[in-house]
Amino acid sequence: MSQYFTLFRIEPAFDIDTENLEQTYRALAARFHPDKFASASAFEQKQAVMMSSTINDAYRTLKNPIDRAAYLLKTSGIDADAPEHTSFASEFLMQQMEWRETLMEARAGKDLESLKNLDNEIRDEQEKLFCGLKQSFARQDYDTAAQQVRQGRFLDKLRNEISSAL
């Protein structure tokens, strides 16, 4: 299941060298680009397209910290995105409501300053969450990591909504 890590010759871990990931991605993408197989057999062309797709999927997954964490959890048999794992701690639910209210008010009032401040606050929360994920994986505390992945998905979605409003 750690196919993506193997493909990029990276040790399966949450904390990875993203510069190495980027360099390896560029090398793999160039090596298996379908255009390089234009004069090859139909089978080889199909293989190149499939490999290119796998490389792109792996890169997107490993580049995004939350997707990388979810992928790591799956390698340990835990699906953080499964419907039965959608609950949040009450404190986080209350914080979600506050952030949503701030977003709605700022959007309605076209208050760019409030939107930027909210975006900065959420970015800071994401950084704290990434530190927490690093610690959870180091302790092999996968239940906590799964909860953090779900929180991270919410934060990603909220930041996307803020970006759309800006």
Curated annotation (Swiss-Prot):
It comes from Neisseria meningitidis serogroup A / serotype 4A (strain DSM 15465 / Z2491). One of its GO terms (cellular component) is iron-sulfur cluster transfer complex. This is Co-chaperone protein HscB homolog. InterPro entries: DnaJ_domain (IPR001623), HscB (IPR004640), HscB_C_sf (IPR036386), HscB_oligo_C (IPR009073), J_dom_sf (IPR036869). One of its GO terms (biological process) is [2Fe-2S] cluster assembly. Interacts with HscA and stimulates its ATPase activity. It comes from the Bacteria. SUPFAM superfamilies: Chaperone J-domain (SSF46565), HSC20 (HSCB), C-terminal oligomerisation domain (SSF47144). Belongs to the HscB family. Residues 3-75 form the J domain. One of its GO terms (molecular function) is protein-folding chaperone binding. Keywords: Chaperone.
